[in-house]
Amino acid sequence: MKCKYAWSHLDLKSGGFAPCFRFKRNDFVESDIDKLPSQVINNADFVKVRQQLRNDEWPAGCIDCQIQEESGLSSYRTRSLENTIHTDPDYESDTIHIKDLQLKMTRACNYKCRHCDTSSNSRFEQTGKDNPTIELKLKKDFNFSHISPPTNKIDIPDDRVMDDLFDNVLPTVENIEFSGGEPFYTRDMYKTLQRMIDDPRIDTKKISLVYNSNMSILEYKGWTVKTLWPHFKRVSVTVSLDGTGDLFNYFRTDGDYQTVLKNIVEVAPLVHNFLFVCTTSAYHAFYMNEIYNDFLDIKKLIPTKKVNIRTTFVHWPQAMDIVNLEEDVKDKILEELVVNDFTAEFAKRLKGNRTLEEPKFKELVRLQDELYDVSCKTLAHKVWDYINE
């Protein structure tokens, strides 16, 4: 099996380094946060992953892609092979040079999304402190650390790591992907771009930038992407649109759908291409036709830009996984679903094997509505109808 991530990519995750942003690094022993990027990219941990993939074996850390591919879906691995933003690696080699770097400059986010947790969003920690009873119930009944103290929070690169990247990785890197948290929600992201522009060892005109963003803001505390992006080869933006319209505002607490649309149109002249991704949970399962039609309307707002749309899926917490809805509910959703390029993988996933014996989504909806003091009756009426059947 080939994977551009395993042979080209470096990511800083909770506790240390990994070859992919989805990789579960539980069995890594030589790639902890005390190491430098240049020390880990060809160590025993990383080489073992490449060797296993070359032998058509799934590394333990690749469980997300394994689940997707065994369900007949595309995966992060298969989609990486379609990525032409950087040159192809030598898949026969165990040692590599990093061409694709992922940086998470903050764990802060200005949204509170229902599928996220404290490991990726520091704002949830205070929410948990303010709601200890709900925090405990989410953890105990759903195995969901939504607002619990983080045990595996994102590690943010410190000065030591950043200096090593500037010395040993960035001068030859071809692509940098910023995620988070929300990447536009920290001065460190903007400062990193400016430092690269100012560094004579780095030719930013040869470096592409990719963002995973909720597109809620374009500037932060005096910094703006508008003056920085023109110095780079090109910019691609993956917009996390987990729902549209009222469903978006309901699922993504503190989000405003119209503001996101305005920002997309405003920044479009600086962007080479957009990818709109709906991280699909049981909340979204009732709205896939509407989401698709709304995505088509967004494409009309930026007609001169290359725009793609796709789904990905929530597996954890299991109660939010679409496969764990009631069987009759899934059958009804499939009956009403218009299958197209956007919804086809959703239909496949919906037919997948259950991972919970008993559905628990209704209970989770009620608990999260209580937590966020909002009712699906007003913003997600199809979810309301479902939980009151």
Across the structure, where does each feature detected by a protein language model lie?
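Catalytic cores of alpha/beta
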Residues: 282-298
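Acidic (Asp/Glu)-rich catalytic clusters
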Residues: 226-233, 268, 299
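Accessory C-terminal segments flanking Radical SAM cores
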Residues: 1-81, 313-389
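A Trp-anchored, charged/polar loop motif used as the substrate-binding/catalytic surface
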Residues: 43, 86-92, 155-167
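Distinct, well-ordered alpha-helical segments
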Residues: 188-194, 220-228, 287-291
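Core AdoMet radical
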Residues: 98-108, 117-159, 171-189, 199-221, ...
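Recognition helices and adjacent regulatory flanks at domain boundaries
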Residues: 64-100, 109-111, 131-132
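Short functional micro-motifs and their immediate structural scaffolds
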Residues: 70, 114, 121
